[in-house]
């Protein structure tokens, strides 16, 4: 049986040095907020919040169509927040192995398709579920309108993401230096 050595050499290091360096590097990139992708993300967040807040303030659980609208609106709102934070703090530069233009393209196309279905479901169910002119009717009508606007915003983002993925209007060096957003 092997015996343990009587002496073991160990090294210690301070974990605070590594943590402090990585935390200080997380500074918000205000250029992203001014970019087309940043402005569209803020628009998607604001309008998406309006969609699910307006639906949530009505008895939506009684109607399956509004359950779908709530799922789409809340899920895409949360995922958009995650992508917004990733790009705001330039975490996409640290996670360089992820093909971000392709990931965003897939997300925005999927979000556009999901919001098309949510908009159609929301708009089709408005007249069937509320008395015209009542508060739930007005809220659901407004939610349908904002769902249409969010759908358009995701569609525009999908178009810009497609251009970024294809590399239209830039070369690899400038798109890397610009952080991957227009």
UniProtKB/Swiss-Prot annotation:
Organism, scientific name: Mus musculus (Mouse)
Transmembrane region(s): 36-56, 69-89, 100-120, 142-162
Its job: Main component of the myelin sheath that plays an important role in myelin membrane biogenesis and myelination. Plays an essential function in apical endocytosis. Regulates epithelial development through the regulation of apical endocytosis. Part of the intracellular machinery that mediates basolateral-to-apical transport of ICAM-1, an essential adhesion receptor in epithelial cells, from the subapical compartment in hepatic epithelial cells.
Cell location: Membrane; Cell membrane; Myelin membrane; Apical cell membrane
Residues with Phosphoserine modification: 9
PANTHER family: MARVEL-CONTAINING POTENTIAL LIPID RAFT-ASSOCIATED PROTEIN, PLASMOLIPIN
GO cellular component terms, A-Z: apical plasma membrane; myelin sheath
Ranges facing Extracellular side: 57-68, 121-141
Family in the record: Belongs to the MAL family.
Keywords: Cell membrane, Membrane, Phosphoprotein, Transmembrane, Transmembrane helix
Entries under PROSITE patterns matching the protein: MARVEL
Post-translational modification: Phosphorylated.
Membrane-topology descriptor: Multi-pass membrane protein
GO molecular function: identical protein binding
Oligomer status and interactors: Forms oligomers.
Protein name: Plasmolipin
One GO term (biological process): regulation of transcytosis
Predominant location category: membrane
Domain MARVEL: 32-166
UniProt gene name: Pllp
């Amino acid at each position: 049986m092997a015996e343990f050595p009587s002496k073991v050499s160990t090294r210690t290091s301070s974990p605070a040095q590594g943590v402090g360096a990585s935390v200080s590097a997380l500074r918000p990139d205000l250029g992203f907020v001014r970019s087309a992708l940043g402005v569209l993300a803020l628009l998607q967040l604001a309008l998406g919040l309006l969609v699910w807040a307006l639906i949530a303030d009505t008895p939506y659980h009684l109607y399956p169509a509004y359950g779908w609208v709530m799922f789409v609106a809340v899920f895409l709102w949360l995922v958009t927040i995650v992508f917004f934070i990733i790009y705001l703090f330039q975490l996409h530069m640290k996670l360089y192995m992820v093909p971000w233009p392709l990931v965003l393209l897939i997300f925005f196309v999927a979000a556009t398709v999901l919001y098309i279905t949510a908009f159609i479901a929301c708009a089709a169910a408005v007249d069937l579920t509320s008395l015209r002119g009542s508060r739930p009717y007005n809220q659901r009508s407004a939610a349908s309108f904002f769902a249409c606007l969010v759908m358009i915003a995701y569609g525009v983002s999908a178009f810009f993401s497609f251009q970024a993925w294809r590399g239209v209007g830039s070369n690899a060096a400038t798109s890397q230096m610009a952080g991957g957003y227009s």
